[in-house]
């Protein structure tokens, strides 16, 4: 599969395909980054791996050659047809390709039989990163994820309480995953070259991952949408019957009703779900 900018440009010309910016189509052209992705994910023969937006198949081909069984979802019809005619005939038993929206099919229709032990390795289209990740965190959870992301998005996902980047997605992600050392990726590793640098985010599922219910996730999101307001007033509006008991937990942790959402640690947000259940 193509790994150089020239080969990628030539293949796109053969396909009559112009990279679509709104789909985040920046194709990986650096073999070292492909190898690093597989290394971080600890891909082994027989692993079940989900890939999002396989594009021209550079990462996909490497996963298949490593012996993984791959479930991939690609929204672009031209790229889906290309993968169907190139990779599927070579790997008819281990490559499963779905033409669909990844946010609606976040695990590429991975069979339930593999849901207990699978990984996600993806050069993730930047435009869908947060809604897709939010959908994945609803479970079942992959044991490991290696995600190519815009560096700014990666920083937001792993931000700590007290920082301006800390938000609802930070709470959901860090409650289920530990952040392992990743890898910075320069814009020159892609064609077309994006305007920003990227980052390989490496996530390892916690021994006891915490999954928020849709109702509590919606509550937390709504609170962070008014992140500069004090938590006491926000909860009085949203939880008139139960907010007081959770605020008591805040006080016990050295915080107060005057605290802003971005300063509240993830374990206290988890306690909100326990209280509501």
UniProtKB/Swiss-Prot annotation:
Specifically dimethylates two adjacent adenosines (A1518 and A1519) in the loop of a conserved hairpin near the 3'-end of 16S rRNA in the 30S particle. May play a critical role in biogenesis of 30S subunits. It comes from Opitutus terrae (strain DSM 11246 / JCM 15787 / PB90-1). NCBIfam families: ksgA. It is found in: Cytoplasm. This is Ribosomal RNA small subunit methyltransferase A. Keywords: Cytoplasm, Methyltransferase, RNA-binding, rRNA processing, S-adenosyl-L-methionine, Transferase. It catalyses: adenosine(1518)/adenosine(1519) in 16S rRNA + 4 S-adenosyl-L-methionine = N(6)-dimethyladenosine(1518)/N(6)-dimethyladenosine(1519) in 16S rRNA + 4 S-adenosyl-L-homocysteine + 4 H(+). It is an enzyme of class 2 (transferase). The keyword RNA-binding applies.
């Amino acid at each position: 599969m193509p790994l150089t900018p020239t080969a990628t440009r030539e293949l796109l010309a053969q396909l009559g395909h112009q990279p679509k910016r709104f789909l985040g189509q920046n194709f990986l052209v650096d073999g070292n980054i492909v190898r690093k992705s597989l290394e971080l994910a600890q891909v082994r023969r027989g692993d079940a791996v989900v890939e999002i937006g396989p594009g021209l198949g550079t990462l996909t081909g490497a996963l298949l050659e490593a012996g993984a069984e791959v479930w991939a979802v690609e929204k672009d019809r031209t790229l889906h047809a290309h993968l169907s005619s190139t990779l599927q005939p070579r790997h008819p038993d281990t490559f499963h390709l779905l033409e669909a929206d990844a946010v609606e099919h976040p695990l590429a229709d991975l069979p339930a039989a593999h849901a207990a032990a699978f990984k996600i390795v993806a050069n993730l289209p930047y435009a869908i990163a947060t809604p897709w990740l939010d959908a994945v965190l609803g479970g079942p959870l992959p044991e490991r994820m290696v995600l190519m992301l815009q560096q700014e998005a990666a920083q937001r996902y792993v931000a700590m309480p007290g920082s301006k980047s800390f938000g609802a997605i930070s709470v959901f992600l860090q409650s289920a995953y530990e952040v392992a050392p990743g890898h910075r990726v320069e814009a020159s590793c892609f064609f077309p070259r994006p305007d920003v640098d990227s980052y390989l985010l490496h996530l390892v599922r916690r021994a006891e991952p915490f999954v928020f219910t849709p109702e509590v996730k919606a509550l937390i999101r709504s609170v962070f949408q008014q992140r500069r307001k004090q938590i006491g007033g926000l909860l009085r509006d949203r939880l008139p019957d139960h907010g007081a008991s959770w605020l008591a937990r805040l006080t016990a942790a050295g915080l107060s009703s005057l605290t802003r959402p971005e300063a509240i640690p993830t374990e206290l947000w988890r306690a909100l779900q326990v209280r509501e259940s």
